[in-house]
Curated annotation (Swiss-Prot):
Pathway note: Secondary metabolite biosynthesis
Conditions for induction: Expression is induced in complex medium (Czapek yeast autolysate medium) supporting calbistrin production. Expression is positively regulated by the calbistrin biosynthesis cluster-specific transcription factor calC.
Name of this chain's protein: Bifunctional decalin synthase calF
Glycosylation sites: 46, 103, 127, 175, 268, 308, 359, 425, 485
Length: 575
């Protein structure tokens, strides 16, 4: 096979292009360092993994004259549209759907005369087909002292699955789904599904539905279930029925940093099972597959509800929102229910009121106490009941069939868990609603999306899910969208507003709570050990040190990451 792409990438970050020399032997090597592997070393690794090593040539290289020589004006024009769609990134080894992480180093919207630099891209990727590929990649990274990252779909708000000069273990093509009609263990007997690490929500819902089941997964169909989603805890429209996605895990198939191919379950390698089930992705081991409970399918009752925010009803509108928060505990306690709603500058939308095994009319009856309060405030609303015979049809009606409902690749978000106890304290509730109101009134077209749930009373195995989830009434995301039509300085100002003012305001309004570790901005400045892991952190770090004593796996804000920093050239260095 041709190794031309390998040779191209080796020169991209040479010292002649401004990369500072490495200052310490405690840093991972990057291109341009004397220790960077030779072409023959990369070719040898490629032979070891049977031709599945790929040098990174960013998709937007077609928009730039140098250094790849792939400029194509027509292809670039098409890519400018495709770049806004999540699906563009799924089947490309090194791409991540996160404009902040892309960092303007090689994007379709900058001048063709600007060189296409790798920046935060991994330098090489192994298309993983099994444990042997992972073991080969880990061994090479250790021998050559280079950074190692784990990537699945690239659905990654925090930039954990890429890094300057990294070798990426790309698990996207481990995409098999096996239905197990009667899984048996000491802890559980019942239906399950074994999901390869590359399986995404939009596909697995279809497969399990055909077998008569439903499974917890993300609301974005491009989310990989057996990767960061579940290992980060995993919120779902079905949380009210079955707990967090991590609560349903039966076993993990992994390769550790020491090259061991293991099964982690409640009876084997139990500490690793505990850590992987909620303790965060990219740091304990490389997941090859996950076996999870699936659940008998059935109807889903729901409804779509809207009312407007106008200059004439501002105070009554926010009074209705405060009434909603007071009502949410009653709603989520009334059954296996969740409620996804959005607040924008134009009003309120409840787009996914999820009540398993009920119908839309029954759902409205559940909502009636709050609807009565809205009517008393003189607010006109619309409510449309919906009935779905199964979960797949329900999900598709809200988010699109398969991956057709994939969202924009321009989403920027940060999140916060809202404590349930605050809903019983009028003062605390007002403080929280005031913080949410600030997002809408001060946030320059920000949207606020909340997912209401109760996972505190659902039986679950011991795991590393952040304890604050068990005490939360909702998780709320603050969302805006990257605008490629404004300057980088203007876009940076929007990010500054989000991470420097608005999110800290919500954190101040919810002391002692926490944050969903999968939904943080790459520039988030919170106390990540406390906010993302809570009291679990010390035990998680012990497990990290046991299975990865050299800290070969690194991801920003992952367990153990406080032992590292990135220098001005992007090298990963020991503190």
């Amino acid at each position: 096979m041709s190794f031309k792409p390998l040779l191209l990438s080796l020169s991209l970050l040479s010292p002649a292009l401004g990369v500072a020399p490495r200052q310490s032997a405690s840093c991972r090597a990057i291109p341009g360092d004397p220790e960077w592997p030779s072409t023959s070393a990369w070719n040898a690794l490629n032979n070891t993994v049977h031709g599945r090593l790929k040098a990174t040539v960013p998709l937007p290289s077609v928009c730039h004259h140098e250094p790849f020589g792939t400029y194509n004006e027509d292809a670039c024009t098409a890519l400018k549209t495709e770049w806004l769609d999540d699906r563009t990134f799924l089947n490309n080894a090194a791409e991540v759907m996160n404009p902040g992480t892309q960092n303007y180093s090689c994007v379709p919207f900058t001048s063709p005369s600007q060189p296409c630099q790798l920046g935060n891209y991994a330098s090489y990727s192994i298309n993983v087909t099994g444990a042997d590929d992972v073991i080969a990649g880990i061994r090479f990274a250790r021998q050559k002292n280079i950074r190692l990252v784990i990537k699945n779909t690239g659905h990654d708000f925090a930039g954990k699955s890429t890094g300057t000069g990294a070798l990426s273990l790309w698990t996207h093509h481990l995409n098999t789904t096996e239905i197990i009609s009667s899984y048996e263990s000491a802890e559980y007997t019942g239906p399950a599904a074994k999901l390869g690490a590359g399986v995404i929500s939009g596909n697995v819902y279809q497969v399990v539905a055909e077998a008569g089941y439903r499974v917890m997964g993300g609301t974005c169909p491009t989310v990989g279930l057996a990767g960061g989603y579940t290992s980060g805890a995993g919120h779902s429209l079905l949380n009210g029925a079955y707990g967090m996605a991590a609560d349903a895990v039966l076993e993990w198939e992994v390769v550790t940093a020491q090259g061991e191919h293991l099964i982690a379950s409640q009876s084997n390698n139990t500490d690793l099972y505990w850590a992987l089930s909620g303790g965060g992705p990219g740091t304990f081991a490389v997941v090859l597959s996950m076996t999870t409970k699936v659940f008998q399918d059935g109807p889903i009752g729901s409804g779509i509800m809207l009312f407007n925010l106008t200059s004439d009803n501002t105070e009554e509108y926010w009074g209705a929102i405060e009434d909603l928060w007071a009502f949410l505990p009653e709603f989520v306690d009334a059954g296996p229910n969740t409620w996804d709603f959005a607040l924008t500058s134009t009003g309120f939308q409840a787009y996914a009121i999820t009540v398993p095994d009920q119908n839309g009319t029954q759902v409205k009856s559940l909502l009636q106490p709050w609807l009565d309060s809205i009517e008393k405030r003189g607010i006109q609303y619309s409510y449309t009941p919906t009935d779905s015979p199964n979960y797949l049809q329900y999900f598709s009606s809200r988010f699109g069939p398969g991956i057709a409902g994939a969202g924009p690749a321009t989403v920027q978000l940060a999140s916060r868990l809202i404590p349930r106890a605050a809903m019983y304290n009028a003062t605390q509730k007002k403080v929280i609603v005031s913080a949410l109101r600030a997002f809408i009134e001060d946030g320059e077209d920000l949207e606020l999306g909340c997912h209401a749930l109760n996972v505190g009373n659902i039986e679950h195995p011991g795991n590393a899910v952040l304890p604050a989830w068990r005490n939360a009434i909702a998780t709320c995301n603050v969302v805006n969208y990257w605008d490629w039509n404004i300057t980088a300085t203007e876009m940076q100002a929007r990010k500054d507003l989000l991470v420097d003012r608005l999110i800290p305001g919500l954190e101040e309004a919810t002391p002692g709570s926490g944050t969903y570790l999968n939904e943080i901005d790459a520039r988030w400045k919170g106390d990540w050990i406390t906010e993302l892991y809570g009291d679990n952190y010390d035990r998680l770090l012990q497990i990290k040190n046991k299975y990865d004593p050299e800290h070969r796996f690194y991801a920003w804000t992952a367990v153990g990451s406080d032992s590292w920093f990135t220098d001005g050239s992007g090298r990963l260095c020991r503190v």
